């Protein structure tokens, strides 16, 4: 919470390209913590800490607010673009994100379909509650993506029960394709 108050958190954007057209179709919003001395603290360190202390909700709100402040005008001018945002497990387990987004989208006049939400398999603690909250996000127009698929416990059969638009396969599996004998037959 102190990092937010001190202005040390920033949202960076990793572009997303369509491989066929080679056009940029959107970006993923990434939270970064830059210390006063200029060093970056790895999200692998500060995100779990924020989850354990209950401060992750403030960080999620910060990302949502900042991205719409920074990119709202761009999104309004380019309705085909979208930004994806990572949600923590606690964000998925309550309907609060839908309420926060409705207020921010109305304020910035951005369409719900232009903000996608990414959750990890590990974030789907209570599947019944997660399904209900993710479906509510989809019902108003948001896309739902599973990030780092393959690193958790979800099977494809389990995923069929969830309101998911896209699977993002974990990088470790993609990097091994064609190089590792065990994965060379994966198509």
Where are these regions (language model features)?
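Short, contiguous acidic/charged loop-to-helix segments that flank catalytic cores in large enzymes
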Residues: 50-54, 177-183
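The catalytic core of metal-dependent phosphodiesterases that act on cyclic dinucleotides
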Residues: 102-177
């Amino acid at each position: 919470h102190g990092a937010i108050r001190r202005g040390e958190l920033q949202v960076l954007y990793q572009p997303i390209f369509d491989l066929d057209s080679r056009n940029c179709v959107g970006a993923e919003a990434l939270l970064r913590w830059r210390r006063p001395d200029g060093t970056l603290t790895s999200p692998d360190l500060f995100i779990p800490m924020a989850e354990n202390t209950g401060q992750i909700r403030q960080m999620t709100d910060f990302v949502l607010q900042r991205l719409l402040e920074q990119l709202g005008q761009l999104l309004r001018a380019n309705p085909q673009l979208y930004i994806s945002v990572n949600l923590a497990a606690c964000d998925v387990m309550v309907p609060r994100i839908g309420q926060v987004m409705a207020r921010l989208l109305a304020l910035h006049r951005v369409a719900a379909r232009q903000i996608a939400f990414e959750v990890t398999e590990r974030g789907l603690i209570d599947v019944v509650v997660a399904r209900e909250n993710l479906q509510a996000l989809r019902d108003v127009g948001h896309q739902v993506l599973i990030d780092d698929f393959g690193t958790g416990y979800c099977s494809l059969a389990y995923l069929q029960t969830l309101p998911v638009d896209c699977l993002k396969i974990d990088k470790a599996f993609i990097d091994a394709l064609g190089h590792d004998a065990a994965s060379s037959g994966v198509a």
